[in-house]
Regions:
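Conserved glycine(s) of the Walker
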Residues: 18, 160, 253
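Catalytic P-loop NTPase motifs of RecA-like helicase/translocase cores
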Residues: 41, 65-66, 98-99, 127-128, ...
């Protein structure tokens, strides 16, 4: 593939609006975890899309929210910094005629950076009367008149994604290929595996418990004789009571989380996986700067 142009695009928006789903849909494979709980994404994730002579590098970001911990501060910092040194911002919003505080803050930041902005109205597959999208468009145009394009789309069904890529291609700059062919994300395999385990906790556990967890891969190796991947994972939680809930009666919850994670990890790795999981208590880790840094969330 002869790549002659590149475009760095930040995908931003409030929590749970579908940023990771959109990134996964454009990349064509699952590189970012998805759940129905806010603040699923904690770090900036690069997704790579090659189309014709253009390489798109999508920056999937945490949802903008009011932080309640050092980790939350870090996540908000990631969002703000992701709007620097990119060609365009794709602002993802719900299909409702209301511009909330997160959208206003992001639009202000986009304006400060003098960034081209594409308004992406996601989840149109949930809209019964398509003419109601005109009210959404009017609400955003009233707040911000600088959108280069407004594109209704659905990350779930794929509607509007080709139109979005055609628009994003207009921001591509001449330059060398940033990521080699076949590379769809900047994340190491072990990072993706850890995130998959965290995704399963978000889906299996209720309320705030999964938000107080961190996942660390302590062993990642491939057996020479069989190609089986040995994966040891430690789940950190903030309270002893949470540890009991994560493990569950007779270890049933941890088995459920591990089994679901192993299936997705095997699909991602294309190999059999022997997964072992442990749960440890690390009190108030979200406000512990040293531990946060050890988990790859660099506050510098």
């Amino acid at each position: 593939m002869n790549i002659t142009k590149t475009a760095m695009i930040t995908v931003c928006g409030r929590p749970n609006v579908g940023k990771s789903s959109l990134t996964n849909a454009l990349v064509g494979e699952k590189i970012a975890i998805v759940s129905d709980k806010p603040q699923t994404t904690r770090n900036r994730i690069y997704g790579v899309v090659n189309r014709g002579d253009t390489q798109f590098v999508l920056l999937d970001t945490p949802g903008l929210h009011k932080p309640r911990s050092r980790l939350g501060d870090y996540m908000v910092k990631v969002v703000r910094e992701s709007l620097s040194d990119v060609e365009c911002a794709a602002l993802l919003v719900e299909p409702i005629p209301h511009v909330g505080e997160p959208e206003r803050i992001l639009l202000q930041r986009i304006q400060e950076e003098q960034l081209p902005c594409v308004l992406c109205i996601n989840k149109i597959d949930t809209v019964e009367k398509k003419e109601s999208l005109l009210e959404v468009i009017a609400a955003y145009n009233e707040v911000y008149d600088g959108f280069d394009a407004i594109i209704p789309l659905s990350a779930r069904t794929g509607d509007g994604l080709d139109e979005l890529l055609r628009q994003l291609e207009t921001y591509a700059q001449p330059g060398p290929q940033l990521f080699p062919d076949g590379m769809t994300t900047d994340q190491a395999d072990s990072q993706v595996c850890a995130e998959i385990v965290r995704e399963k906790m978000l889906r299996c556990l209720d309320k705030e418990i999964p938000h107080g967890t961190a996942v660390e891969v302590t062993k990642f190796s491939e057996r020479e004789d069989s190609g089986i991947i040995d994966l040891d994972v430690t789940i950190y939680c903030e309270k002893a009571s949470h540890k009991g809930i994560i493990i569950g009666r007779g270890g049933e919850m941890l088995k459920r989380i591990s089994s679901a994670a192993r299936r997705d990890i095997e699909k991602f790795m294309g190999a059999k996986v022997f997964l072992q999981t442990w749960v440890k208590v690390k009190e108030n880790w979200r406000d512990n700067p040293n531990f946060i840094r050890s988990q790859g969330y660099n506050e510098e």
